[in-house]
Amino acid sequence: MVSPVTVVKSEGPKLVPFFKATCVYFVLWLPSSSPSWVSTLIKCLPIFCLWLFLLAHGLGFLLAHPSATRIFVGLVFSAVGDAFLIWQDQGYFVHGLLMFAVTHMFYASAFGMQPLALRTGLVMAALSGLCYALLYPCLSGAFTYLVGVYVALIGFMGWRAMAGLRLAGADWRWTELAAGSGALFFIISDLTIALNKFCFPVPYSRALIMSTYYVAQMLVALSAVESREPVEHYRLTKAN
């Protein structure tokens, strides 16, 4: 079992650019009512830094571990989704929604189907159903179906992220905690987006959405560091 102190020492320095980029976003706080390529870059910059965080572990690591590669690809789609959402008032909200739907599919695939954890799946299904029931009266037209599919996808991703979570014992792994926590923060962020867009104005919505979103993406990226594939496979691949 790797201690939290070891994790901070080994991974913390690689995350410094991400923390700096996140601070830049919140310090500048460019108005969302006036989208521009500059505001798009500033919003996407922390995600770009998470690309670099994963690449800092070596291209060989990504190529040897499909789960880490899928998280990297998910981060790429996230950045595209962020760019679309900057321009959502110009008609690109659905484009952003679709990009993040693809992101959740890549993340769920990275987290894998073992262990199955059916009880966790049932809990996530119930929570997803409650979220959709809360949003349903506010939805109309195509969003009635699009939001329903999106809720199902993020709920599935959350199930797979939390399925392997063990909080104690010799089998405890910090990357599982990172994955589960990241999924939870992602759900909070996206639920806030939906409530604010379709139902009612959420106080301080942008600060809540972006803070939980960046934390979620950081935790998901961290979960890729300790790959789900056998370590021996990576060593053999690296040696060859």
UniProtKB/Swiss-Prot annotation:
It is a multi-pass membrane protein. Its main location: endoplasmic reticulum. One of its GO terms (cellular component) is endoplasmic reticulum membrane. Keywords: Endoplasmic reticulum, Hydrolase, Lipid metabolism, Membrane, Transmembrane, Transmembrane helix. Residues 43, 92, 137-138, 196-206 are extracellular. One of its GO terms (biological process) is lipid metabolic process. It is found in: Endoplasmic reticulum membrane. The chain crosses the membrane at residues 22-42, 44-64, 71-91, 93-113, 116-136, 139-159, 175-195, 207-227. Catalyzes the hydrolysis of the vinyl ether bond of choline or ethanolamine lysoplasmalogens, forming fatty aldehyde and glycerophosphocholine or glycerophosphoethanolamine, respectively and is specific for the sn-2-deacylated (lyso) form of plasmalogen. Plays an important role in lysoplasmalogen metabolism in the adipocyte tissue and macrophages. This is Lysoplasmalogenase TMEM86A. It comes from Homo sapiens (Human).
